[in-house]
């Protein structure tokens, strides 16, 4: 085994690098530089040009640094980058030198790695929990990165070409198309700067894995999701979907959010420059489904239409301990991913319906029923099974009406979502939701005056505004603007 490379370590320090900093600069694991300096490892030839560049030396000078043992002997005529003569050139034995690429990370376990893992996770959690002075502050700051033409009314969220409708349309008029064609999207990378270290001292393979291990929300499951492929307003709103998985989309959204939060913290609370957002920059147009993997969930504002004109609406506060994203914010309800109830091919097609997805969310969030996740032995019979049968009947009678506003995008995560409104006659609402639960798996209902709902008034929306997510605030403002149409 070679001796300690004190000359190499001295050059690193002279250039202002910690061992971890040099490791990041040359693209190796954090413990590798320490092993180079102790003489345990020797960098492979193909890696040396990058090391030389980081240390601002020539390859020949780097070889001198790497071959200098800890017992120096004077040399003459050798000046390294203007520094005094260094040590004699006594190379370590090639037979005893081990390259970093030949050593498994498990060989390097010890206090050094444990401490670095601890710091990595601590910093990752600190950045992830950054929320700004107000819950949606970071989302609105992120919106400033994009031109005004890309922002929805109010400027809280983004919207793409043909995404948001000027006037809501009835849900039945929205046409859905399903495509079996595979349409690959370039992978978002590199993502090492937004991922913490595993217990082995290696980067997590994905953001969802890190959330599972370090945040541990009660609800985090990788299920099949419908993937947005095309949006068109030719002859009405038409949405084309394929399939993806929840984690594939979640990983992209959370990596983008984490990168923005880290840059925001580093800038002292200012809007980050694009140069500090390499992942976001590589995406380019975030509204292009060919460049950005999207699975737009469905969020529905539920309004109880009162015969006396005292209309009310439902709000939900998400529990940060239960959900992987959006914890602590108030949102319209019900809200959920656009997903089939199971992986079975029959369900992928049977559940490919906005209305059926919305019904399942009402069943879960309003009535507290278990999540319809394919755990049953057969497909859902929406015509006969309750509460779906009653939902269908109320809608057929014209007393449970639904409207679609199109799509918006959260500026922080670049996550797309569909915005819908449901208007139920008071008598129908009270009958369908007589078993309304105040608390469900994802959070609790927000009400006032001892009730489980809020008055549908401009004043109530204004009072709720600081607690609302950006996309829910946008939908509420649109619905209030269009209240005569929706409640007529």
Please report, for each region that a protein language model flagged, where it lies by residue.
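DNA major-groove recognition helix of helix-turn-helix/homeodomain DNA-binding modules
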Residues: 46-62
């Amino acid at each position: 085994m070679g001796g300690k490379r004190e000359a190499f370590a001295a050059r690193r320090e002279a250039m202002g690098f910690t061992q971890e900093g040099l490791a990041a600069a040359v693209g190796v694991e954090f413990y590798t530089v320490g092993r180079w300096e102790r003489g345990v490892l020797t960098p492979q030839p193909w890696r040396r040009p990058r090391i030389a560049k980081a240390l601002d030396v020539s390859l020949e000078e780097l070889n001198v640094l790497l071959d200098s043992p800890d017992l120096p002997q004077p040399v003459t005529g050798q000046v390294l980058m203007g520094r005094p003569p260094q040590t004699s050139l006594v190379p370590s034995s090639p037979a005893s030198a081990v390259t970093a690429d030949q050593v498994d990370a498990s060989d390097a376990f010890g206090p050094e790695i444990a401490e670095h893992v601890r710091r990595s996770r601590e910093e990752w959690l600190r950045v992830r929990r950054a929320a700004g002075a107000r819950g949606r502050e970071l989302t609105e700051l992120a919106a400033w990165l994009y031109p005004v033409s890309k922002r929805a009314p109010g400027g809280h969220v983004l919207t793409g070409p043909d995404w948001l409708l000027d006037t809501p349309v009835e849900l039945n008029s929205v046409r859905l198309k399903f495509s079996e064609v595979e349409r690959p999207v370039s992978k978002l990378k590199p993502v090492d700067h937004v991922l913490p270290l595993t217990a082995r001292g290696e980067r997590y393979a994905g953001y969802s894995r890190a959330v599972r291990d370090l945040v541990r929300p009660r609800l985090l499951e990788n299920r099949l999701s419908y993937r947005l492929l095309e949006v068109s307003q030719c002859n009405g709103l038409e949405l084309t979907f394929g399939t993806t998985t929840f984690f594939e989309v979640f990983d992209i959204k959370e990596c983008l959010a984490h990168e923005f939060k880290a840059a925001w913290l580093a800038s002292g609370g200012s809007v980050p420059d694009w140069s500090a957002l390499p992942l976001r920059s590589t995406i380019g147009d975030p509204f292009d489904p060919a460049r950005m993997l999207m699975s737009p969930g469905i969020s529905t504002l539920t309004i109880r239409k009162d015969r006396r004109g005292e209309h009310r609406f439902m709000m939900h506060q998400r529990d940060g301990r239960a959900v992987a994203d959006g914890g602590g914010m108030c949102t319209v309800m019900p809200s959920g991913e656009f997903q089939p109830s199971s992986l079975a091919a029959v369900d992928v097609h049977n559940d490919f319906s906005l209305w059926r997805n919305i019904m399942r969310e009402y069943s879960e969030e309003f009535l507290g029923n278990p999540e319809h996740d394919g755990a049953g032995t057969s497909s859902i019979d929406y015509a006969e099974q309750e509460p779906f049968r009653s939902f269908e009947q109320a809608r057929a009678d014209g007393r449970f009406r639904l409207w679609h506003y199109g799509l918006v995008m959260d500026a922080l995560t670049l996550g797309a979502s569909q915005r819908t409104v449901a208007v139920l006659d008071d008598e129908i609402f009270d009958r369908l939701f007589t078993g309304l639960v105040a608390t469900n798996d994802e959070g609790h209902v927000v009400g006032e005056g001892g009730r489980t709902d809020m008055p549908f008034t401009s004043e109530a929306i204004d009072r709720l505004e600081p607690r609302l997510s950006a996309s829910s605030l946008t939908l509420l403002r649109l619905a209030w603007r269009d209240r005569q149409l929706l409640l007529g």
